[in-house]
Regions:
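Conserved catalytic submotifs in the C-terminal HATPase_c
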Residues: 97-99, 120-130, 167
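A conserved beta-strand-to-alpha-helix junction within the catalytic ATP-binding
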Residues: 95-110
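Short conserved segment of the HATPase_c
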Residues: 184-198
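Primarily the dimerization/phosphotransfer
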Residues: 14-48
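Short alpha-helical segment of the dimerization/phosphotransfer core of two-component systems
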Residues: 69-74
Length: 257
């Protein structure tokens, strides 16, 4: 007959095994994500070094642009991995400030517009919006992730709608980012916020990503005591982020999350 202590040891061993497997899975996924752009960069760099004189100017420019794009992909992946590492170590310092949302949305839309020049961005705000209490850097990252996702998964010359509204009864501010992109199947809705989760379809395979953006977004929203949800049909998705309206006593508070 097993003692109570032996059950505790077995349970701890199982937890340790699960943690070890999670770490192995994480390393395997990161290695794959790093290997893909690095292989591309090395391949095109080798071609330029060994066959430069035989390539046309157009081919050289094309290969250099591929190297640049894959380098940017690597930088984005490393930045996301550093963010994930901070969040999981519970050493992420949050410095809260009371802010007006519209200027942050306007600035982020302008940044995204420079990347997706054919898209149209429609922005609407309620009048007399209350302020919200957030870490400004983290809030900007949330905005950029959501607007970039809406743009990335939509065809050229698509429209992205961004709205900020007040829910008077619940004293909250609701940020909505809506697109007319490829949509998300109902069976995938609960998966999209998971780490390294990407919907596998012929359309999504053509779009670069590492499956960390929405995981980071959801984690940051929840660390700042907000909520995030998504609705999607056959075409288009709408992400909503909800924050409580600011209170004066919260301004300037710091927290390590």
């Amino acid at each position: 007959m097993k003692s109570k202590n032996s059950y505790i040891i077995v349970t701890m061993d199982e937890k340790q095994n699960n943690l070890d497997q999670a770490h192995l899975d994480f390393i395997s996924t990161v290695s794959h994500e790093l290997r893909t752009p690095l292989t591309s960069i090395r391949g095109f760099a080798d071609t330029l070094l060994t066959s430069y004189d035989r390539l046309t100017p157009e081919q050289r420019e094309k290969f250099l642009n591929i190297i640049k794009d894959q380098s940017n992909r690597l930088i984005n992946l490393v930045e996301n991995l550093l963010t994930v590492s901070k969040m999981q170590s519970d050493k992420e310092l949050m410095i809260y400030k009371s802010i007006d949302v519209p200027p942050f949305v306007d600035a982020c839309v302008q940044m995204i517009k420079n990347q997706y020049k054919t898209h149209k961005y429609v922005v609407n705000y309620d009048k007399n919006l209350p302020k919200i209490m957030v870490d400004t850097d983290k809030f900007q990252q949330i905005l950029l992730n959501l607007i970039d996702n809406a743009s990335k998964y939509s065809k050229e010359a698509s429209t992205v709608w961004i709205s900020v509204n007040q829910n008077y009864s619940e004293n909250t501010v609701i940020l909505s980012v809506k697109d007319e992109g490829i949509g998300i199947a109902q069976e995938d809705i609960n998966k999209i916020f998971n780490k390294f989760s990407r919907i596998d379809s012929p359309l999504t395979r053509k779009i670069q990503g590492n499956g960390l953006g929405l995981y980071i977004t959801k984690t940051l929203v929840e660390k700042m005591n907000g909520e995030i949800c998504v609705e999607s049909k056959e075409k288009g998705s709408e992400f909503k982020v909800i924050f409580k309206s600011a209170t004066p006593e919260d301004d300037g508070k710091k927290a390590i999350c």
